[in-house]
Amino acid sequence: MKVVVTGFDPFGGEAINPAFEAVKKLPAEIAGAEIIKVEVPTVFGTSGEKVAEAIETHQPDMVICVGQAGGRETVTVEKVAINLAEARIPDNAGQQPSDVPLVEDGATAYFTNLPIKAMVKNCHDHQLPAAISYTAGTFVCNDIMYHLLHLINTKYPTIRGGFIHVPFLPEQTIDKPTFASMSLEAITDSLFYMIEAAVKTQEDIQLQGGTTH
């Protein structure tokens, strides 16, 4: 089995992006699956193109994209991506789209086909906090997830894929004292256990979850 794992470059004035820093620290193999690491630009459209190129090149069985969500308290795996670009800040190419679809005539939204409950439970079983998120935002993280799932739903039906958000690193919050952070080691371990569960689990487990707001 091959798993492509992508991580973004720094954006929004940050000098580092914990997403790719953690991806780089993953081992070359997890649960018998080859881990292929790819850095992608924080740019609308281009990030999805890089995923398409990685799929063409490596022919993976699974693609997991990883991005930074400053302000989140823990690693979160995303349930859904929506067909909308709404950028509060410019991307790394200076684009700042507002209220435009990511794919003309594309589906309104796509659900991940990863076993996200099993992924979260595997983190909990190893004493690591983790959660399911029901919004990937409207910036490039949602963009890459939507384009990945669009490819899966229209061209690569046997591939499983989805997106994981990670918090700031402690050094990123020195001037943001109210923001949560997580060590690079803990983020990397969380990614490892999420990927391990995704590789080992075909049918997701039954586990009560959800949010009230």
Curated annotation (Swiss-Prot):
Principal location: cytoplasm
Family: Belongs to the peptidase C15 family.
The protein's enzyme class: hydrolase
Species name: Enterococcus faecalis (strain ATCC 700802 / V583)
InterPro entries, A to Z: Peptidase_C15, Peptidase_C15-like, Peptidase_C15-like_sf, PGP-I_bact-type, PGPEP1_Cys_AS, PGPEP1_Glu_AS
Nucleotide-binding among keywords: no
Function text: Removes 5-oxoproline from various penultimate amino acid residues except L-proline.
Name of the protein this chain belongs to: Pyrrolidone-carboxylate peptidase
Catalytic activity: Release of an N-terminal pyroglutamyl group from a polypeptide, the second amino acid generally not being Pro
Active site (catalytic residues): 78, 141, 165
GO CC entries: cytosol
Subunit structure: Homotetramer.
Gene3D superfamilies the UniProt entry points to: Peptidase C15, pyroglutamyl peptidase I-like (3.40.630.20)
EC number(s) per entry: 3.4.19.3
Top-level taxon of origin: Bacteria
Keyword Protein biosynthesis recorded: no
Location within or outside the cell: Cytoplasm
GO biological process terms, semicolon-separated: proteolysis
Keyword terms of this UniProt record: Cytoplasm, Hydrolase, Protease, Thiol protease
GO molecular function, one term: pyroglutamyl-peptidase activity
